Swiss-Prot record:
Subcellular location: Cell membrane
Gene (name only): atpC
Family from the record: Belongs to the ATPase epsilon chain family.
One annotated GO molecular function: proton-transporting ATP synthase activity, rotational mechanism
Highest classification ranks of the organism: Bacteria, Bacillati, Actinomycetota, Actinomycetes, Mycobacteriales
Keyword Membrane annotated: yes
SUPFAM superfamilies per the UniProt record, alphabetical: Epsilon subunit of F1F0-ATP synthase N-terminal domain (SSF51344)
Protein name in UniProt: ATP synthase epsilon chain
Pfam families documented for this protein: ATP-synt_DE_N (PF02823)
Length: 121
């Protein structure tokens, strides 16, 4: 199966990079699924985005993304975020608490983490 290079970069450093067969996330224009050889595109991610990365022969990866942009070329997907948190590092109780915050930014971060955990918000 064909693969595409994927990188998740936060303000301070590269968070993750590797190969994927499919990437799924939400932009301000709607949901997007990306396969290798996708048309070039730049899009703004929603504030409470979760990113799913499917890899051949490996478990899917989920990331909670705090705002940012998505850049797609024929061979690469770049996710440029203010911050990103892997599913394995998410504290579910804190994410639930944060999702109910009166601060819109904190609430968006909480929702993104819950989505990365596979919960419907």
């Amino acid at each position: 199966m064909s693969e595409i290079d994927v990188e998740i970069v936060a303000v301070e450093r590269e968070i993750w990079s590797g190969k994927a067969t499919f990437v799924f996330t939400r932009t301000t224009s709607g949901e997007i699924g990306i396969l290798p050889h996708h048309i070039p595109l730049v899009a703004q991610l929603v504030d409470d985005a979760a990113v799913k990365i499917e890899r051949e022969g490996s478990d899917d990866l989920w990331w909670a993304i705090d705002g940012g942009f998505l850049s797609i070329t024929d061979t690469k997907v770049s996710i440029l975020a203010e911050s990103a948190q892997a599913r394995a590092d998410i504290d579910e109780a804190k994410a639930k608490t944060d999702s109910g915050s009166e601060d819109p930014r904190v609430a968006a971060q909480g929702r993104a983490r819950l989505r990365a955990l596979g919960q419907t918000v």
